[in-house]
Amino acid sequence: MTQKIIKVEGMSCEHCRNAVESALAKLNGVSSAEVNLDENHVRVEYNDSKVTFENMKEAIEEQGYDVK
């Protein structure tokens, strides 16, 4: 498993947290996603042979947030 911290702009509440975590959890290969609202990032644990950073970036951006 690979772990990555992705900086995300625009998250400010529980709805934001749930939207990002749910979008990432739906991706095949993501085993966990945990948003930290104070730090504006999400920590993702995933299988890099099944899912790419670009896949995760797209899933987050589709929810209306910016990946930095």
UniProtKB/Swiss-Prot annotation:
Cellular compartment(s): Cytoplasm
Domain HMA, first and last residues per copy: 2-68
Keyword Iron: no
GO molecular function list: copper ion binding
Main location: cytoplasm
Alphabetical keyword list: Chaperone, Copper, Cytoplasm, Metal-binding
Record-linked InterPro entries: CopZ, Cu-bd, Heavy-metal-associated_CS, HMA_Cu_ion-bd, HMA_dom, HMA_dom_sf
Gene Ontology annotations of biological process type: copper ion transport
Entry GO terms, CC: cytoplasm
Protein's job: Chaperone that serves for the intracellular sequestration and transport of Cu(+). Delivers Cu(+) to the copper-exporting P-type ATPase A (CopA).
Name assigned to this protein: Copper chaperone CopZ
Organism: Staphylococcus epidermidis (strain ATCC 35984 / DSM 28319 / BCRC 17069 / CCUG 31568 / BM 3577 / RP62A)
Lineage: Bacteria, Bacillati, Bacillota, Bacilli, Bacillales
Gene behind this protein: copZ
